[in-house]
């Protein structure tokens, strides 16, 4: 996003018209990069399991066919498949797999030299799972986040992005409660 290749307002249906259902819902038509990043795309259930057990259909298509029961941006629902779709977006606009795109921008500046990421049957890094690295390398990522995007005096990730990524985006169930507790 900071390089201008994607914007928070880019729409999913514009990025992948070839995977769009024949008659997309109004909610699907409104899903943006921001909605995917904040896991507020409008799904009320996580469609990830269906993708991991189905190697015959595009995972992007499975994501887009899953019911968008809420207006995007209004309901938080943990959604690993949404992060996969973000990975596919990065691959589409950069012509690089996410792991390759991030290597010079994130991993190398953190001193992480041995990293791999699981892929879908379509050859897209999974995004929300399957990142393989050493424990101490994961700790470097945590330290960078604690230091507002800096590592060894270098600004690796914009501080504004760290602030936004670690701030509440939509009202949700208080920490430590599940949705059933919130109704009591």
Q: What spans do the regions from the language model cover?
A:
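Surface-exposed patches in mature extracellular/periplasmic domains of secreted proteins
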Residues: 7-9, 48-50, 152-154
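Generic alpha-helical structural context detector
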Residues: 34-38, 61, 108, 140-143, ...
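Penicillin-binding protein/beta-lactamase superfamily catalytic region
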Residues: 76, 100, 115-184
């Amino acid at each position: 996003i900071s390089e201008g290749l994607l914007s928070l307002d880019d729409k999913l249906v514009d990025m992948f018209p070839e995977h769009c259902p024949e008659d997309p819902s109004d909610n699907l038509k409104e899903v943006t990069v921001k909605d995917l990043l904040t896991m507020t795309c409008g799904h009320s259930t996580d469609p990830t399991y269906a993708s991991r057990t189905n190697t015959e259909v595009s995972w992007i298509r499975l994501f887009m066919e899953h019911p968008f029961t809420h207006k995007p941006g209004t309901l938080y629902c943990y959604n690993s498949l949404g992060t996969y779709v973000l990975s596919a977006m990065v691959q589409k606009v950069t012509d690089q797999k996410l792991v390759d795109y991030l290597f010079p921008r994130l991993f190398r500046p953190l001193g992480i030299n041995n990293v791999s990421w699981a892929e879908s049957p379509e050859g897209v890094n999974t995004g929300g799972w399957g990142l393989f690295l050493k424990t101490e390398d994961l700790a470097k990522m945590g330290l960078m986040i604690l230091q507002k995007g800096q590592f060894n005096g270098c600004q690796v990730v914009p501080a504004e992005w760290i602030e936004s990524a670690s701030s509440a985006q939509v009202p949700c169930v208080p920490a430590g409660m599940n949705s059933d507790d919130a109704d009591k």
